[in-house]
A protein has these predicted regions:
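Secondary-structure boundary elements
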Residues: 1-4, 59-61
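C-terminal terminal-subdomain/extension
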Residues: 2, 88-160
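Mixed-charge, Lys/Arg-rich low-complexity intrinsically disordered regions
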Residues: 2-25
Length: 160
């Protein structure tokens, strides 16, 4: 049989590719993508977007969006104290992508990316790591116990 040179990606429709990619995204997966105001990320120095690491917390009940928290190198000193307290340190000794420095998950700022947008930004090199189930439980706890959390949003993504 002659090989046509087509890949699975060539054969699948855009909708099918989106479904395959989105269904492969799991709680605890870490990605690095160029995010913008659509995901609640503000650019720096005149840029409209920023490359950010983030950890997936879940899919919404309709399968249309992914919930996530941003992972930062430091806690923004301009945040209110209540939000600073909801940053969970993740240890570089557990995760190679941190390159020897502990980073922080901002559990006070639950963000959403549409499935369509995620697929649009996705490539296999964007996947960086998997956060341990112990750390995911800590992240969820911090998010749930944040007094200003959007309860409706947390419920939509299965945290409540």
């Amino acid at each position: 049989m002659k090989h046509s040179g087509n890949t699975i990606g060539d054969i699948l429709s855009e909708k099918m590719k989106a479904e395959v990619i989105a269904s492969a995204v799991n709680e605890g997966d870490v990605y690095r993508m160029c995010l913008d105001e659509r995901e609640g990320i503000i650019g720096k120095n005149g840029a409209e977007s920023r490359n950010k690491y983030f950890v997936i917390i879940g899919h919404d009940s309709d399968g249309n969006a992914l919930g996530f928290f941003v992972i930062d190198t430091e806690i923004n000193r301009n945040l209110p104290e209540i939000r600073k307290q909801k940053h969970l340190r993740i240890e570089s000794s557990k995760y190679d992508f941190l390159n020897g420095t502990d980073w922080y998950v901002d559990c006070s700022d639950f963000k959403i990316i549409s499935k369509h947008r995620f697929v649009e930004l996705f490539s296999s090199d964007k996947a960086k790591a998997k956060i341990s189930s112990d750390d995911i439980e800590k992240i969820k706890h911090e998010a749930i116990t944040y007094r200003n959390a959007n309860r409706k949003m947390l419920k939509r993504f299965g945290l409540l």
